[in-house]
Amino acid sequence: MESTQPEVRLGKVAVADVTLAFREVGSPRGVPVVLVHALGSGAATWAAFGARLAAHGRRVLALDLRGHGGSSWTDAYSLTSMCDDVLAFLDAQGIGRTDLVGHSVGGAVAVLVAQRQADRVRRLVVEDTPPPPERAPEPLAPVTEPADPLPFEWRLIEPIITELRTPDPGWRERLKLISAATLLVGGGPASHVSPDALARVNAAVPDCRLVTVEDAGHRVHSVRPEEFWAVVAPFLCGTPAGEVTRPRE
């Protein structure tokens, strides 16, 4: 049988001081949705989810954040620079307004985008991303760099994790800047991101809903892809959960 899996278009685009690698599927004329991966992951983590979005007529773009995969490995890393990269990527692709989906660190980046240029985000999905801590946590134990090659730059871990773990008294006020309809997806007690933490985010974003996929853990879209799709598809595509489809093989 002839496969109807969507064609994956691989590309790179130079923006400011970096080159960003990305994967694109679906109709170039479809409503765009940009997918942002977690720390240490990459664009390919969204392959199955992106294919299903493409089957619903969406233009799907998943990028490697700086320091990951085929994108530039740079001298400095921060959530702000990653946010700048995503906004520059939208400009380079000619995308004025988009849906945005982010997992973990990618969710933190997506939130920054939706705060800084609220008019550019139509719908926002944030998967298991914690808010800043209420107080400074205990220091993390040092972790030794693995001997085997990694698909990301080891040097980016410390500054990004430090930024995520730093208390930020103004975070609630900045979440009020988000005008996009927002869906938070949590992984339940099996995740290190507590339901209470996600509830604080849910209470701060003006137009927001929180859904928990019980026992999914931190990587909801990978560990529980069917449940993740059933939750996110109606929000992004207006697809009833009982009518979700996947590309045929």
Residue ranges and their predicted role:
Residues 2-19:
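N-terminal cap/lid segment of alpha/beta-hydrolase-fold proteins
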Residues 21-70:
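Conserved HGGG/HGGXW glycine-rich cap/lid loop of the alpha/beta-hydrolase fold
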Residues 45-47, 71-76, 136-137, 195-196:
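Conserved catalytic-core motifs of eukaryotic protein kinase domains, centered on the activation segment
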Residues 83-98:
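Conserved acidic catalytic loop of the alpha/beta-hydrolase fold
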Residues 96-133:
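Conserved hydrolase catalytic core segment
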Residues 127-177:
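Helical cap/lid subdomains and adjacent loops of hydrolase enzymes that gate the active-site channel
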Residues 163-204, 209-212, 221, 225:
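Conserved serine/cysteine hydrolase catalytic core
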Residues 208-209, 214-249:
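Catalytic active-site module of serine/aspartate enzymes centered on a nucleophile-bearing elbow/loop
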